[in-house]
């Protein structure tokens, strides 16, 4: 069941209109991105557009395939634009992503793209990051204790291994790493937070997107 489906559908229809012939488009995850992909597939059929898509997860790659759309990779092409959802967006367009767990590949495709659209309904707009959602990090399995110790010292926060629904143990990423979630208790500058995360040994990536020139599209 998709929450706020009407608002998300409206955003999806708007973003699909940006597609032009022979473009390469990066596809993020989340329900709004999925609805946008469906709208893009309709546009491909209706207007006969030749589009190539770069997926950020196996799940999205499966959807692209089911819709009969063409796929490529970052090794073969550079995205003209990228679209994705977000869990939180602050007033300076810093964002937290990653409830789906694909944020490392999402950040790769985001950084590779010329134009970046973040599609959210108004419930995702916050005064400061961490207000509603924890910050997800991807951690090398052997480094869980080391990362926990470092973040307790640097942030005063204890990350928790994200439990996997339906099976024992934690969520494993497509890279074979563990996802941990950090509850951000105090208001902290996103650039400073990014620096702390990047300087923590054992973390391979985070759902904090800061310093990107993004265009936020909301209902």
Question: Where do the language-model regions lie?
Answer:
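N-terminal active-site beta-alpha-beta segment that forms phosphate/nucleotide-binding
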Residues: 1-84
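Conserved phosphate- and dinucleotide-binding cores of soluble alpha/beta proteins
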Residues: 3-10, 58-219
């Amino acid at each position: 069941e998709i929450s706020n489906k009407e608002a998300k559908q409206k955003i999806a229809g708007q973003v699909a209109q940006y597609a032009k012939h022979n473009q390469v488009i990066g596809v993020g995850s989340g329900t709004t991105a999925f609805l946008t992909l469906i709208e893009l597939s309709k546009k491909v059929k209706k207007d006969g557009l030749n589009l190539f898509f770069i997926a950020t997860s196996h799940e999205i790659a499966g959807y692209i395939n089911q819709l009969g759309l063409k796929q490529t990779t970052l090794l073969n092409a550079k995205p003209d634009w990228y679209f994705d959802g977000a869990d939180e967006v602050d007033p300076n367009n810093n964002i937290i992503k990653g409830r789906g767990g694909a944020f490392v590949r999402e950040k790769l495709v985001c950084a590779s793209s010329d134009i970046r659209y973040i599609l959210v309904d108004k419930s995702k707009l916050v005064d400061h990051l961490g207000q509603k959602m924890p910050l997800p990090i991807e951690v090398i399995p052997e480094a869980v204790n080391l990362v926990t110790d470092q973040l307790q010292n640097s942030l005063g926060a204890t990350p928790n291994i994200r439990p996997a629904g339906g099976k024992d143990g934690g969520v494993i990423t497509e890279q074979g790493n563990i996802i941990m979630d950090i509850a951000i208790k105090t208001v902290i500058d996103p650039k400073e937070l990014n620096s702390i995360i990047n300087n923590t040994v054992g973390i391979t990536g985070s759902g904090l997107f800061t310093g990107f020139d993004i265009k936020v599209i909301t209902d």
